[in-house]
Amino acid sequence: MAAKKDLLTQLRGKSDDDLDAYVHENKKALFALRAENLLQNKVVKVHMFSTHKKNIARALTVKQERKGKVHG
């Protein structure tokens, strides 16, 4: 739980451009995981799918909070 709060404080400290880069990096990693999964690679860490998705959602939530849109 503390790791999530630390990540949120780090994300809130970043600029919008840094948040966009963070989202892009996580989307690239998610795409790479999907590609490895399609190739039926046995070393794919399945838990990383949800980790990257949640990181993307957290970063986008921080961006929305800055715009004043908390819920949608």
From Swiss-Prot:
Coiled-coil regions listed: none
Alphabetized UniProt keyword annotations: Ribonucleoprotein, Ribosomal protein
Full protein name: Large ribosomal subunit protein uL29
Organism name: Chlamydia pneumoniae
InterPro entries: Ribosomal_protein_uL29 (IPR050063), Ribosomal_uL29 (IPR001854), Ribosomal_uL29_sf (IPR036049)
PANTHER family according to UniProt: 60S RIBOSOMAL PROTEIN L35/50S RIBOSOMAL PROTEIN L29, LARGE RIBOSOMAL SUBUNIT PROTEIN UL29C
GO MF assignments: structural constituent of ribosome
One GO cellular component, as annotated: cytosolic large ribosomal subunit
Annotated family: Belongs to the universal ribosomal protein uL29 family.
NCBIfam families: L29
Disulfide bridge positions per record: none
The UniProt record lists the keyword Cell membrane: no
Originating gene: rpmC
Gene Ontology biological-process annotations: translation
